[in-house]
């Protein structure tokens, strides 16, 4: 199928899976796998800017990840703080706008304060890339929150039932982006793991066998090039 110049991915999401398995494979601590994963994010952010992608949404920590061993969760909390301290100055220079979403309050005041700092520091109006980071996020949990918010607004007569549509749902969601063009999952598993259930309704989905720490700019570019070759019909026929 011929590539279309207009068929470019502007809104990309990534399930960054495989940090732990990569660490075990290389006889390293799990925390070392997560650290390596952060360095890959930096590479993909740089390439996203170069490719003029509007938003990059990454699954850093799921709602279900709270079930992981306490030591691993503690290490991830520290990694979040360290990554912000290390990367925010560069992201600011790159005009990358950071946004965090999900049940972030569960991370505690120290982490939440650092997230707020990072968002404030990178809040550029003329941003080259929106980097949306899911922390403590789950798609089903987001649906529950949306229903509660909208129901409350209806009860308080702030909106009427007839007003409820896609825009109202988006406004009630914690997810900053409306629709995802391309979803990439590394690590070999072929599932979406409760990520952006509403926003990926018409996303193209690519499953990559490589673990996230082995994912490269070259791999990312191949995904973007493969996306260009896809005939996206959105339920229509080619001649519609």
Regions found by a protein language model. Name each.
Residues 1-240:
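Flexible, compositionally biased loop and terminal segments
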């Amino acid at each position: 199928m011929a590539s279309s110049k207009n068929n470019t991915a502007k809104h990309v999401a990534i399930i960054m899976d495989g940090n732990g398995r990569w660490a075990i494979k290389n006889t390293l601590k799990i925390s070392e796998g997560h650290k390596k994963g952060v360095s890959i994010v930096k590479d993909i952010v740089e390439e996203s800017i170069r490719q003029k992608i509007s938003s990059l949404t990454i699954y850093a920590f799921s709602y279900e990840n709270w079930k992981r061993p306490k030591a691993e969760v503690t290490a991830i909390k520290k990694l979040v703080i360290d990554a912000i301290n290390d990367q925010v100055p560069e992201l600011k220079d790159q005009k990358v706008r950071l946004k965090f979403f999900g049940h972030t309050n569960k991370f505690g005041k120290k982490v939440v304060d650092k997230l707020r700092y990072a968002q404030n520091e990178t809040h550029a109006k003329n941003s080259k890339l929106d980097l949306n980071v899911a922390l403590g996020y789950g798609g089903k949990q987001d649906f529950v929150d949306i229903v509660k918010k909208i129901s409350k607004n209806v009860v308080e007569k702030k909106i009427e039932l007839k007003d409820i549509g896609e825009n109202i749902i988006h406004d009630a969601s914690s997810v900053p982006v409306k629709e995802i063009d391309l979803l990439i999952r590394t690590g070999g598993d072929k599932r979406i793991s409760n990520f952006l259930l509403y926003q990926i309704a018409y996303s193209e989905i690519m499953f990559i066998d490589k673990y996230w720490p082995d994912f490269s700019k070259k791999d990312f570019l191949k995904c973007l090039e493969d996306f260009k070759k896809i005939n996206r019909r959105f339920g229509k026929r080619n001649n519609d």
